[in-house]
Regions:
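Hydrophobic core of transmembrane alpha-helices in multi-pass small-molecule transporters
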Residues: 6-21, 132, 211-225
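Intracellular juxtamembrane helix-capping segments at the cytosolic ends
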Residues: 20-34, 41-42, 225-238
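Flexible cytoplasmic inter-helical loops of multi-pass small-molecule transporters
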Residues: 96-113, 299-300
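Extracytoplasmic gate region of multi-pass secondary transporters
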Residues: 116-179
Length: 300
């Protein structure tokens, strides 16, 4: 019990807070430098985040087997900490906003809503709801994907590929779809992703063998792409000056979904019901984005 509490205090809370402060700051800064290509700017960052999942999976498994001075999970934490600290410090030292004139392309982002103003718009609640409903398609299955793969005909090595290719799918979704959204629009991109997530969730229910890996990789592509399009969608709707804080409030939808849906699935002891919950979430997210339209004026 005390070890668990110590882990939360020493790692989970500091790591969670650090990510919460760092990631929105980087995303909002990148959008200000590339205000005309916000999807590209955030997509490159998101792609790096997605690829980190594949690296961490392979690194931790290697650490558990042991290599050099890195032995076991404790050694993996020490090694990752030693790598992360200088990289993040160096990146933070050079991070700065561009001159004001570079931040605003002509005719765009005429609304500059503060967080308080944003929270009074229905667009905020539709966006946050869509983000929340994007989570069950992946987060209901990511903790059990190895077990699920083996139950459906894969051996342990093959089932491990669902994690690796899922990370590749995540990286591809985070990089490619925000770039596509620069050309076809954020709303159209999100509608397509939710529709694909709904179809893949249905296919995942019946998948066996390597189709489990294929469907899961597709779902991680859609889930991560939806998350990666969000920063640009946020600034399109609510403006750039408060981009970091506004994005943080929108990302609360993801936090709610990542806690609520797995909790409900475990509480109700859902097995096949997880697939129904994932499909319902994708359909609800599609409906929320379908109802989403630009903010017409500053809410007072």
């Amino acid at each position: 019990m005390y070890k668990r509490q110590g882990f939360f205090l020493a790692f989970s809370i500091p790591a969670g807070l650090g990510t919460a402060f760092l990631y929105p700051s980087i995303q909002s800064c990148a959008q200000k430098w590339y205000a005309g290509r916000k999807g590209l700017a955030t997509g490159v960052i998101g792609g790096a985040v997605g690829l980190s999942g594949a690296f961490l999976t392979l690194f931790v498994r290697a650490a558990l087997r042991g290599f050099g001075p890195v032995q076991g999970i404790r050694g993996a934490f020490w090694a990752l900490g030693a790598l992360t600290l200088p990289v993040c410090l160096a990146g933070s030292a050079v991070l700065s906003d561009p001159p004001q004139k570079k931040q605003q392309p002509s005719g765009k982002n005429t609304l500059d809503l503060s967080p308080g103003q944003m929270l009074r718009t229905k667009q905020y609640w539709l966006c946050a709801g869509a983000v929340c409903f994007s989570t069950p398609a992946v987060l209901l299955f990511s903790p059990i994907i190895l077990k699920l793969g083996m139950e459906r005909g894969l051996d342990e090595t093959a089932a491990l590929w669902s994690i690796v290719l899922g990370s590749v799918g995540s990286a591809a979704g985070r990089m490619l779809m925000p770039m596509l959204s620069d050309h076809i629009g954020r709303r159209a991109t999100d509608l397509g992703l939710f529709a694909a997530s709904l179809g893949l969730s249905a296919a995942f229910w019946a998948a066996r063998g390597w189709w489990v890996v294929v469907c899961y990789a597709g779902l991680t592509f859609c889930y991560s792409a939806l998350a990666a399009v969000l920063p640009a969608l946020s600034t399109d709707l609510f403006g750039l000056p408060h981009a970091g804080v506004n994005y943080g409030f929108l990302a609360l939808g993801q936090s709610v979904g990542s806690l609520a849906f797995p909790f409900a699935a475990n509480l109700l002891a859902l097995e096949n019901g997880r697939h129904l919950l994932a499909m319902a979430g994708a359909a609800a997210g599609f409906a929320a984005i379908w109802a989403l339209h630009p903010v017409q004026k500053d809410p007072r």
